[in-house]
């Protein structure tokens, strides 16, 4: 097992490139899909335990008509609020309400860093507080033991639409991604992985990525920010 044992959901919408479609991936179930069920307005994917691993809505303005009166979907990532998950549950006929507020972005602490010979990469172990330490291959210059940063779990979706998968990099397993502020759509420049205020507990969900909010009280800037 390499996932964090708790489910989370990534919801992604893009009007133009996805032609008004929205997709969702349920992270810790994302690699166990066995069958697909279709409707003219949606489809979903189910594993051998009869649990949904992901879903698509082909015309969200139709499926979420009343919902659109009080809420607009963001271009890109959308936070899985209780209201959204209730509506998705109603449409699919599956209870996904427990996924409300469950996101793939979590605060982690780097507990070991080993350079990979003849590359700029490092083999890192990170602690999320939710499971055993995870192996991540990272190329950031600023990664170091003891720093807190943001982990995107396997099955999570970045603001760019990229889905994070378990992979091998330079011959080593990597089961997630440590992200820069640029990759989290918080900053235009890529200055290494984001550094989180050391007072923040590991395992906390990192929701700034949904708010497009730069330098919250969680983020370490040049001047240390004290928690209120």
UniProtKB/Swiss-Prot annotation:
InterPro entries: NA-bd_OB-fold, tRNA-bd_dom, tRNA_bind_bactPheRS, YtpR-like_sf. It holds the Pfam family tRNA_bind. One of its GO terms (molecular function) is tRNA binding. This is Uncharacterized protein MG449. Disulfide bonds: none annotated. Keywords: RNA-binding, tRNA-binding. Residues 99-207 form the tRNA-binding domain. The keyword RNA-binding applies. It comes from the Bacteria.
């Amino acid at each position: 097992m390499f996932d964090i044992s708790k489910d989370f959901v990534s919801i992604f919408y893009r009007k133009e490139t996805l032609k008004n479609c929205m997709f969702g991936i349920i992270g810790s179930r994302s690699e166990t899909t066995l069958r697909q069920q279709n409707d003219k307005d949606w489809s979903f994917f189910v594993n051998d335990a009869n649990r949904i691993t992901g879903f698509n809505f082909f015309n969200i303005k139709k499926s979420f008509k009343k919902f659109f009166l009080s809420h607009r979907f963001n271009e890109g990532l959308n936070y899985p609020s209780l209201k959204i998950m209730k509506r998705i549950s109603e449409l699919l006929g599956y209870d996904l309400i427990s996924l409300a507020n469950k996101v793939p972005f979590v605060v982690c602490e780097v507990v070991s860093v080993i350079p990979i010979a003849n590359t700029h990469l490092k083999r890192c172990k990170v602690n999320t507080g939710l499971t055993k330490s995870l192996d991540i291959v990272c190329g950031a210059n600023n990664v170091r033991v003891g720093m807190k940063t943001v982990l995107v779990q396997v099955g999570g979706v970045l603001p760019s639409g990229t889905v994070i998968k378990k992979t091998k990099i330079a011959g080593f397993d990597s089961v997630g991604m440590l992200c820069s502020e640029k990759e989290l759509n918080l900053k235009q420049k890529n200055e290494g992985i984001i550094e989180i205020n050391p007072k923040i507990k590991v395992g906390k969900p990192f929701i700034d990525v949904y708010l497009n909010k730069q330098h919250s009280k969680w983020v370490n800037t040049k001047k240390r920010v004290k928690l209120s």
